[in-house]
Regions:
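Membrane-interface interhelical connector segments
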Residues: 31-47
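Extended, low-polarity transmembrane helix blocks
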Residues: 1-31, 50-58, 62, 68-142
């Protein structure tokens, strides 16, 4: 049984941890380690348009910040799922374990699940701008 007194804090921890992960992957890896130009070049090297590298950077950076702040976390988490599905696709041939050479697909798939969990359970405690109830109701009926 879910403890309704503590559940908002569990959702808060999940939301913030997921947001920090997106921020780390965008700002640390894509901006400082690989650089934006290098990231775009990588996307081009795997047969995708190079501009996808910039789009993914901005999606992760903006989405991560919105998740940490708790601004419309449900739709933001759902909108970020395709980014991680794409990451899983890129790493698929490397095997399951993320510590494999060039990274496996386990971590991106886990983050897809975590993003879906945030989309389902909501922002939790300390959200600056929770998802409007009308949007949640519409989402639940879909």
């Amino acid at each position: 049984m879910i403890d309704n007194r503590l559940a908002p804090y569990g959702a808060f921890i999940l939301r913030v941890a997921l947001g920090v992960m997106y921020l780390a992957h965008s700002l640390v890896l894509k901006l400082y380690v690989f650089t934006l130009a290098g990231n775009a070049q990588f996307f081009g090297s795997i047969g995708l348009p190079a501009w996808f590298g910039y789009a993914v950077f901005f999606a992760e950076a903006i989405g991560g910040a919105l998740l940490v702040l708790g601004v419309y976390a449900r739709p933001v988490a759902l909108a970020l799922v395709p980014v991680l599905v794409g990451a899983a696709w890129v790493h698929w041939g490397n095997g399951w374990v993320f510590s494999s050479p060039d990274g496996g697909w386990e971590y991106p798939v886990f983050l897809v699940v975590a993003s879906l969990a945030v989309a389902l359970v909501g922002e939790g405690a300390y959200a600056l701008k929770p998802t409007p109830p009308a949007l949640v109701t519409r989402f639940a009926r879909a």
